Amino acid sequence: MGSRIKQNPETTFEVYVEVAYPRTGGTLSDPEVQRQFPEDYSDQEVLQTLTKFCFPFYVDSLTVSQVGQNFTFVLTDIDSKQRFGFCRLSSGAKSCFCILSYLPWFEVFYKLLNILADYTTKRQESQWNELLETLHRLPIPDPGVSVHLSVHSYFTVPDSRELPSIPENRNLTEYFVAVDVNNMLHLYASMLYERRILIICSKLSTLTACIHGSAAMLYPMYWQHVYIPVLPPHLLDYCCAPMPYLIGIHLSLMEKVRNMALDDVVILNVDTNTLETPFDDLQSLPNDVISSLKNRLKKVSTTTGDGVARAFLKAQAAFFGSYRNALKIEPEEPITFSEEAFVSHYRSGAMKQFLQNATQLQLFKQFIDGRLDLLNSGEGFSDVFEEEINMGEYAGSDKLYHQWLSTVRKGSGAILNTVKTKANPAMKTVYKFAKDHAKMGIKEVKNRLKQKDITENGCVSSAEDPLPKTMPSPQAETQDPRLREDRRPITVHFGQVRPPRPHVVRRPKSNITVEGRRTSVSSPEQPQPYRTLKESDSAEGDETESPEQLVREPWGPTPAPPDRAASIDLLEDVFSSLDVEAPLQPLGQAKSLEDLRAPKDLREQPGSFDYQRLDLCRSERGLSMAAALKLAHPYTKLWSLGQDDMAIPSKPSITSPEKPSALLGTSPALPLRPQNQEGILSPSIKEETPIPTPGSITIPRPQGRKTPELGIVPPPPTARPAKLQAAGGPLGDFSSEPLQMDRERQAALSPALLSGLLPRAVPQGPTELLQPPSPAPGAAGTGSDALLALLDPLNTAWSGSTIPSHPATPSAATPFIPQLSFPPTVTPTPFVQTPLNPFVPSVPVVPPSMPLSSTPARPFGTPPASLGPAYAPSILLSSSGFYAPHRSQPNLSALSMPNLFGQIPMGAHTSPLQPLGPPAVAPSRIRTLPLARSSARAAEAKQGLALRPGESPLLPPRPPQSLQPTPQPSVPTQARDPFEDLLRKTKQDVSPSPAPALAPASTSVEQLRRQWETFE
C-alpha cells in the first residue's frame, strides 16, 4: 500500500523521556535525558536522537519564547517505518516531555503528555508511574474503543481508516486555518509532482501540523521520500539534498537555510501565507479536477467535518481512479498493472499528460504495488478511496473492472479461500456497492417512467400507486392555468404537437367516475395504451376503446361494486332529468342461443322479460356511459343479453355464452366476428356494427360518423309500448289471471327468448336455418314464420298465417288512448298508439320478393274480425330504444321493406305495476346510425318476437302508476302515406264530429307539426 505506518506494533509506545538542557556555568550544553520509562530501555542511539529532535530550534534566538507547546517529529527505522515523537515543551522551552510510538495517535498522546507534565510539576510520582505502566502494558485496542487508564485519564482509540475531520483532527484543523485555499492547491500540486518542499513557521505546533496535514491529503498515497516534519539544527544540510523531500523548518533556522544553494525548492511560509515555487505544477494539472477541488474547498471553508479531506479524496479518485482499467487478469497468472493501458484510457489533453508523469511517481508506484500485493495474496482491500471510486464516475463501471470483480469473487490464487474464510471487507464493500447501485438504478428508471406516464397520460400507471388519482377540476384549472400547462405532453406525433387533452372522463378500470373528475386506476397488467395522433383526435370529445383492450378484457357483464355504484350517479350532472337509481341486485350472465334451444328450457322456463321504461331523454353518450357501470342498472342488463350480430348465427361455435353488450350506434367501428354467406346482415351493416366490451364506455369517434341517408331520421322518445306476446296456447286459452299478467310483463329484448320459436333440433346449415322450423313442444303458439320472415332482409312476402294474434282479455280498466302514427283505414280501436314523431319517411322501394320455401299452418289461429290492426308484425327496437311507426298491411305477400315493421301498440296489460304514458323527459339527440335500414330492423326484430310461454320476468316490475287497458288485435289495413296523418288530423279538428279513437285528447295538429318540424 506504500504506507509507512507500522501495522500491529508490540506496545502502545516504546519509550517516554524527559529531556532538558543541563546548565553548566553560563553556557548551554547538549540536551540530556532526565528521566525515562521504561527504565530498562536500552536503545541508546534512539535516545541520543530524541534529545536533538526535542529542541528543533535555536534556543538562544528571540523566537524561543514563542515556541508552541506541542509538536511531533518523525524518526524512520530500518524498515522505513515511521516512529512519531510526540513532544510537549515546558514554559520557557527549557524541558521537553516526549513519547515515542509507532501509533499516529496525535490527540491521544498530546493529552497524555499534558497529564504526565502535570504529575511531574506536582511531583505526583505514584500517579505518574501508574499511568505509564498501565499504558505500556495495554494491548493495542481496536479503533473506536474507549480506554480508561485511570480515574481522570481515558481516551478513544482513533481510526486511521477514516477521513480526518475538523476539528477532531488537530493537524488538519491547524493546516486549514493557517494556509489559504490557493496555497493549499499549489502545495498539493507540488507534492503530486514530488518536488523538494520546505515549509517554514515560527510556531512548532503549526509547522508540524501543516506537514502532517498536507501529507494526509495525498491519501490513499503516501509521501515516499524524505519526510521530516521538523528539522533539527544539526540536519540542515538535508535541505540541499537532490532527492524530493518534505521538510518543516523553524523560523529561527531559516536564516542559515537561505544561505544554502536551494535550487528548484518550493517554499511555503506559513507565517506570511506565501508560497514560492519555480514550477507551474498547478496549471499543468487537469483544470476540471482542480476547479472542482477549489470550489469544494471554498464551500467547506466554514463548516466542520471531513469535507476538506473528502474534497481532496475526490480529486485523487479523479486522477487515479482509472487504475482499475489497467489491471491485467490472466487465468492462473498474477494480476499485473499495465502503464500503457492506464495512460491510453484518456486519448488526449492535460489528463493524459499528467498520467504519463504519474506513472513515474514513487508514490503512485507504491500505491499500485500495494494494491497488487493485496489482490494476489487474496487479502483484498476496502477503504474510502475505493468507495469513492465506486460512488463516483471514475471508470468504475468499465468492463475490465467488472472482470476484475468477477475474478476477485470466483478466486484467483488464494482469493477464493480468503473470501470464504475471512469474508474480507473489500468483497463486502464491492458487493454492497453493486447491490445498492442496482437498486438505485431500478428506482431511477421507475421514477422516470412514472414521470413520463404522468406527463403523457395525466395519470399514473404503475403498481406503486393503486389508488385513484383525482385530477384538477375544470374550475381549478380555469383559476390556475398552470395546472393545464403541466398536463400538456411533450411528445410529438407525426410531426405535430399533440393538443392538450380536454377535460373528458377517462375510463378507469373500476368504471366508477365521480362528477366530471377524471379518475384513473393504475393497472400493471394492463397499462394505458400509447395512442397515436389519429386515436388521440377522438379523445377530444370522449375516450374510445382500443381493440387491444377489447381482447384483454373479459367478455360478459361484470357487476360494479354495489357500495360504489349505488352512491355514484354518473349521469346526474350530465342529464338533469335522470331520476333512476341503480338497483343493488345480482345480475345473471347472458345465455347463448345454444343454451336456450334445449327443449327442457322451452318447457320449464315460463314467463318473459319485463321491458322497463327506458329513459329516452338520455343521449347516446348517456346510454353508453350507463352501460359502463358493469351493467348494474336494469336497463343495461337488457342490453347485455347477446344482441351483437342481429342475426341467428349459422354456426353454434361462433356464438359465445358470454356476449358483450351491443350498444348500437354508440361505439366506434370495430371488426365483427366472421359471418357466413347466408348471414342476414348486409356488408354495410356489418361494417357499422361494433362489438364493445361490457362495462366499457364506447363512444363513436367524430371521424367515424356517417351522413344519414335520405329519409332516415331517428324517431324521438315515445311512451312505453305494449309487448308482442307469443301466446302459450290456443287463442283465448288462459289458465289463470297471474299467468296473463306475467305474459304481459314480457320484454322482447333478448335473442335468448328466440328459443321459444326454435325447434328441438338446431339447424346447422344455412339452408336448414331458413327452413320454417316445426314448433317445439310446448310452444304451439309461437310464430316461426314471422320470425324467419323478420330475419330475412330480402323477404317481402308475409303470409297471413304468420300474423300473431293475441287473446282478448276482458278488462274493465280505464281506456287509455295513445297516439297513432299512421291510422288504419278501418275503424280504429281506442287503444292504438303512435310515437311522438309520426313523420318518419321511408323510401318506398320494393325489393324483389323472396318467399319462404314452405308456409306452415297458422300457429296462432284466426284472429277475430273485430280485432284491429294492433298486432300486425311490429318491431320493438330494443337495442336503440326507439320504436318504428306502425304500418297497416293489406297484402302481406307484397309488402315493401320500409312498411314491414309497423308500430307496436299497447299490449294486453292487466298488471297495475306498468306505467302509462310517455316519460316526461326531453327528446334525445338525433342518432347518426341509419336505423331505418331494413336489414338492421330485421336483425332487431328477432328480439321483439322472442317469447317463451310461462317464462317469469327477470327484472322487477315498475311501480304502479295507473291501470292499462287491453288492446285488441286488429286486421291488416292498407299502408298510408306518412303525411296523410297530418292531413287527417287537420280534417278531424275541422270536422264537427271527429273520431274519438283517432284524435286523442292530448294530441293536436300543432303538436304534430311542431314535432315534424323538429326532425326535419
UniProtKB/Swiss-Prot annotation:
Q: Which UniProt keywords apply?
A: Cell membrane, Cell projection, Cytoplasmic vesicle, Guanine-nucleotide releasing factor, Lipid-binding, Membrane, Methylation, Phosphoprotein, Protein transport, Synapse, Transport
Q: Name the residue ranges with Basic and acidic residues bias.
A: 479-489, 977-988, 1007-1016
**Do you know which Pfam families this protein is assigned to?**
dDENN (PF03455), DENN (PF02141), uDENN (PF03456)
Q: Could you give a GO molecular-function term held by this entry?
A: phosphatidylinositol-3-phosphate binding
Highest taxon above the source species: Eukaryota
Activity control summary: The guanine nucleotide exchange factor (GEF) activity is autoinhibited. Autoinhibition may be the result of intramolecular interaction between the DENN domain and the C-terminus, which is disrupted upon phosphorylation. Activation is regulated by Akt activation.
GO CC annotations on file: clathrin-coated vesicle; clathrin-coated vesicle membrane; cytosol; dendrite; neuronal cell body; presynaptic membrane; synapse
Annotated region Disordered: the residues are: 453-565, 681-737, 763-783, 935-1016
> Phosphothreonine (modified residue): where?
T519
Q: Where is the composition biased (Basic residues)?
A: 500-509
Tell me where the sequence motif Clathrin box sits in this chain: 569-578
On this chain, the residues bearing Phosphoserine are: S473, S520, S522, S523, S536, S538, S546, S592, S750
Q: Where in the cell is it found?
A: Cytoplasmic vesicle, Clathrin-coated vesicle membrane; Presynaptic cell membrane
Motif FXDXF motif per UniProt: ranges: 381-385
Q: What is its main location?
A: membrane
Comp. bias intervals (Pro residues): 954-970
Which stretches make up the dDENN domain?
300-378
Domain cDENN intervals: 162-298
Which segments constitute the uDENN domain? 13-145
What's noted about post-translational modification? Phosphorylated on serine and/or threonine in an Akt-dependent manner. Phosphorylation probably regulates the guanine nucleotide exchange factor (GEF) activity, possibly by disrupting an intramolecular interaction between the DENN domain and the C-terminus of the protein, thereby relieving the autoinhibition.
> In this chain, where does the modification Omega-N-methylarginine occur?
R760
Role, per record: Guanine nucleotide exchange factor (GEF) regulating clathrin-mediated endocytosis through RAB35 activation. Promotes the exchange of GDP to GTP, converting inactive GDP-bound RAB35 into its active GTP-bound form. Regulates clathrin-mediated endocytosis of synaptic vesicles and mediates exit from early endosomes. Binds phosphatidylinositol-phosphates (PtdInsPs), with some preference for PtdIns(3)P.
Q: How does it assemble?
A: Interacts with RAB35. Interacts with clathrin and with the adapter protein complex 2, AP-2. Interacts with ITSN1 and SH3GL2. Interacts (when phosphorylated) with YWHAE.
Q: PANTHER family, alphabetically?
A: DENN DOMAIN-CONTAINING, DENN DOMAIN-CONTAINING PROTEIN 1A
Q: Protein name, please?
A: DENN domain-containing protein 1A
Q: Which organism is it from?
A: Mus musculus (Mouse)
Name of the encoding gene: Dennd1a
